[in-house]
Amino acid sequence: MPRYKVFAAIDLGSTEITMKIAEVSKKNGISVLDTVKYDLSIGKESYAVGKISYNLVDKICNCFEEYLRIMKSYGVDEYVCYATTAVREASNSEYIIDQINIRTGIKVTIISNEEERFLHNKAFALNNSYFDDIIEAGAVLVDVASGSVQVSHYEQSKLQFSQNLPMGSLRVLENLSTVKNSTTSFSSVLEDFIKAGINNYKNVFYKNPNYKYFVIMGNQVRYITVSYTHLRAH
């Protein structure tokens, strides 16, 4: 009997398709062997027109066919493939996953926002030993994605509430795409739009301003970090 298994996890996201391949064993836990990313702005089309075109589905299938070859080279035993906001909100989502399955054999599971954020928080907890300490002291976890932002409030180790804001980076840009071409101060419009969304959230949900910890995470954080570093440098 082998002492380990090789798993693959595919994330069909709003801006990229990511695959991680990992070796899992009782002795060593999870060891990531490879991470592969393919940039594909599915959300840009989904958020703008409410559906995903056949041309884009074709690109997804081509990517998955390459991922299958990579999985075979690693001897992957099992895989999961999750689709998130961009596919979930597309009016032709069932057609998309059917086409992927017919062409590649890959079974795609569309997960809910709640399932997606639960997995993100669980991954954060597993990778950060201080998680239990900060949620005991009081913490706000902000999960920034392309389609939305999830804000979760913890006190005394319990989740008090969690709210989803449709203010993901890509969705906001798509919502304001017509304004962008008709103004010379788009950055100000963008700032006002985001502030309005945050203020609405604070007025309705934000009851305790004394949380000790504020944690920001998600696949869009790296862009925020780069932007902040650029501003500091200038």
Question: How should these model regions be labeled?
Answer:
Residues 2-29, 136-161:
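Gly/Thr-rich phosphate-binding beta-strand-loop-beta motif of the actin/hexokinase/Hsp70
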Residues 2-3, 113-140:
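Conserved phosphate-binding catalytic cores of ATP/NTP-utilizing and phosphoryl-transfer enzymes
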Residues 15-54, 157-186:
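Short glycine-rich, Thr/Ser-proximal phosphate-binding strand/loop in the N-terminal lobe
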Residues 34-126:
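N-terminal phosphate-binding loop and flanking beta/alpha elements of the actin-like ATPase fold
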Residues 65-78, 128-132, 200-212:
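Phosphate/pyrophosphate-binding loops at sites that engage ATP/ADP/AMP, CoA/4′-phosphopantetheine
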Residues 76-85, 210-220:
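Short glycine-rich phosphate-binding loop at a beta-alpha junction
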Residues 176-217, 224-225:
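ATP/pyrophosphate-binding catalytic subdomain of soluble kinases
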Residues 229-234:
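Conserved small/polar residues in nucleotide/adenosyl-binding loops
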